Every structure is written in structure tokens, then in C-alpha cells.
């Protein structure tokens, strides 16, 4: 396990995840695991390039040894184009949701930490992102990361705008 965790941390550094450290392979509370929403978004972008992982996280149900396993990611069921990624909760970290969706060849990633309404907020963020970026002409060069970097006012304004648009 220790060798695997070393490899995880080396890969994190290679991906430029400067605010991430792994202490175990499963991510459960240890006091030594940490990351940021930005690093988790970068990690998701890299991970989704792996076709097998992408297939697993986007699977809604699977039958294994006669049992039906159901993915807990509600966005897979509710959000058009959702790829999935990571749901989770630990006592120390709280609720963390990393989701991605793809439409018209454009993929967006949303990350929230300790958001009590994360499913709805992710849908709102993704809706806002697809609306702002459009689908005809890329607004930014391909593969450029667009990040709001701690601009909470802009984040919540985007969520509120998307929620208001859905009510109309």
C-alpha cells in the first residue's frame, strides 16, 4: 500500500496538483489526505482521459455476481450528458462531489466541497457553463482551463442565474 501511495503522490506532482497529498489509496479520513477543488478538477480532467475509468464512472447500473449495483451519482440519472466522476462523504472532509458533463464535444467539470445542495448546484454550474461557452465556436483555446479561483460571488451568481432561468 505504501508503494502505491508513493506512486499516487508522484503522479499528483506530475499533474501539477500542488495542493494535494495522498496518505492512503481509498481517500478515507487519515488526517494526512488533503486536496483543493481546483486540484480535484485537474485530477478529474486527467482521469477522464482513461477510457476504462470513464466507462466505469459513467455506468448507471451493473450486475456483478448476480447483484445489481447502482451508481449513487444522481446526475447520471438527471443531467443530460453527465459522465459522472466522484461522489463521497467522510466526517473530516464532508461532502465532496466532482462531476463532469459533455455536450457537443465540450466537457465541463464541476467540483464542490461541503455543499448541502451539491446535486442541484452542479446542474446549475454545468448549465451556466454550457450556456456561457456555447457550442458553435470555442470561446477559449482548446484544453485551456477556465477557473473562477475562489471568486465566490461569481460562483453563486452563476448558480442563481441558472436556477432563475430554469424557473422561467
Predicted regions and their residues:
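Glycine-centered helix-coil hinge/cap
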Residues: 1-2, 90
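Domain-terminus/edge residues, biased toward the C-terminal soluble/receptor-binding domains
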Residues: 14-21, 29-168
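Short, charged, amphipathic alpha-helices and their helix-cap/turn boundaries
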Residues: 2-20
